[in-house]
Design a protein with these regions (language model features):
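RNA substrate-binding interface of SAM-dependent RNA methyltransferases
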Residues: 1-87, 148-157
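Aromatic-residue detector
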Residues: 21, 34, 38-39, 111, ...
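Long, charge-patterned amphipathic alpha-helical coiled-coil/hairpin "stalk" segments used as oligomerization
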Residues: 89-130
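Structured adenosyl-cofactor binding patch, chiefly the S-adenosyl-L-methionine
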Residues: 120-158
Length: 158
């Protein structure tokens, strides 16, 4: 299992399927803390209840906030990362650094639910990181799976 201190957040989506897929991906790859923020339309009315059912059945936690700053205020992570495309990222995913931080406290990783997913203001709310393996934009669910798989490998090896 990935650390109980990992908080995976999906921000700014209007797709109920994307919300459900994000939750299923997190739970399927051993992340138990699934967070949603700025979820609108059918994603909020249908996607969140579907995701909540899946997460709770798997023994996980699902939280819902109106914005990223609310997540940070309520959960007080020691570090916040924004998982973005190479175009917006400042450095590749620092897996070893994240593993060390998870031993010390909560780490929030935010994934944008639409393209580009995060506003300029939101990009300043954490450290922007990208997946080195990805050479062009991929969907946020694939990016989440890539991140969690890479993190799991580093945790197993440490």
């Amino acid at each position: 299992m990935i650390s109980k201190n990992l908080l995976m957040a999906f921000h700014n989506s209007h797709s109920r399927k994307a919300v459900k897929y994000f939750a299923d991906t997190c739970i399927g790859l051993s992340c138990r803390n699934v967070i949603f923020s700025k979820i609108t339309s059918s994603a909020a009315s249908i996607g969140i209840p579907d995701a909540q059912k899946s997460v709770l059945k798997a023994g996980g936690n699902l939280l819902f906030f109106s914005d990223i700053t609310d997540i940070q205020e309520a959960l007080e992570p020691s570090k916040s990362y924004l998982l973005v495309s190479r175009k917006y990222g400042r450095k590749s995913i620092p897996y070893n650094e994240i593993v060390t931080e998870l031993k010390l406290g909560k780490v929030l990783v935010i994934v944008g639910g639409t393209s580009p997913g995060l506003t300029r203001r939101e990009l300043d709310l954490g450290e922007c990181i990208f997946a080195d393996e990805v050479i062009s934009d991929i969907n946020p669910i694939a990016l989440t799976a890539l991140f969690l798989t890479g993190l799991s490998k580093v945790i197993k090896d440490s």
